[in-house]
């Protein structure tokens, strides 16, 4: 794909003019319904298997990085190595109302062992990905404390296959954590 085409695609997938958690949620859900996966799991790729032996598609998963890192990843066709497991993503949506950005940063740092999450800027930007078959669900989960003191748990997924297909990126933009 030509560089201009990649630039246009990256720009068209950016979530803009969204000021609340609810607006971001609606935008991502709409994009999720409209998308047509451009890649299918191939032979030799990791897949989640549920208790009855069928493949699970976790749907949209989220990568938290800063915007320049996301741009480099997209244009370079690769995911960042942001944990000891390779690329780490989660089902924590970037519009979660009852959790602060600082708490998300703490949870990502603890889950990944990655020093980059010391700075909240590292988790203030998201990429919503549709990557069936590329990621394996980890045994551990990310545990966060809500703004009301409740325990929240989110699944973690990882892959050491760091190739990123342009069709895997559903949307990207600024997180709207803690915005009620």
UniProtKB/Swiss-Prot annotation:
Organism domain of life: Bacteria
A Pfam short name: RolB_RolC
UniProt GO MF annotations: beta-glucosidase activity
GO BP terms, alphabetized: carbohydrate metabolic process; cytokinin biosynthetic process
Skewed-composition ranges (Basic and acidic residues): 26-37
Top-level class of the enzyme under EC nomenclature: hydrolase
EC number(s) recorded for this UniProt protein: 3.2.1.-
Stretch list, region Disordered: 26-54
Keyword Ribosomal protein in record: no
Assigned keywords, A-Z: Cytokinin biosynthesis, Glycosidase, Hydrolase, Plasmid
Known role: Hydrolyzes cytokinin glucosides thus liberating free cytokinins. Contributes to the root inducing activity.
Protein name as catalogued: Cytokinin-beta-glucosidase
Organism: Rhizobium rhizogenes
């Amino acid at each position: 794909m030509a560089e201009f085409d990649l630039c246009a695609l990256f720009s068209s997938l950016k979530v803009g003019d969204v000021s609340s958690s609810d607006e971001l949620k609606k935008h991502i859900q709409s994009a999720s319904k409209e998308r047509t996966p451009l890649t299918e799991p191939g032979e030799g790729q990791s897949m989640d298997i549920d208790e009855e032996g069928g493949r699970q598609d976790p749907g949209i998963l989220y990568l938290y990085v800063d915007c320049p890192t996301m741009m480099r990843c997209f244009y370079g066709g690769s995911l960042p190595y942001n944990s000891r497991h390779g690329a780490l993503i989660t089902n924590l949506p970037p519009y979660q109302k009852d959790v602060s950005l600082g708490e998300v940063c703490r949870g990502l740092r603890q889950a990944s062992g990655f020093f980059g999450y010391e700075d909240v800027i590292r988790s203030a930007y998201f990429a919503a990905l549709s990557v069936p078959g590329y990621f394996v669900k980890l045994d551990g989960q990310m545990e966060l404390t809500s703004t009301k003191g409740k325990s929240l748990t989110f699944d973690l997924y990882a892959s050491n296959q760091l190739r990123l297909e342009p069709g895997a990126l559903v949307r990207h933009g600024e997180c709207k954590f803690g915005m009620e």
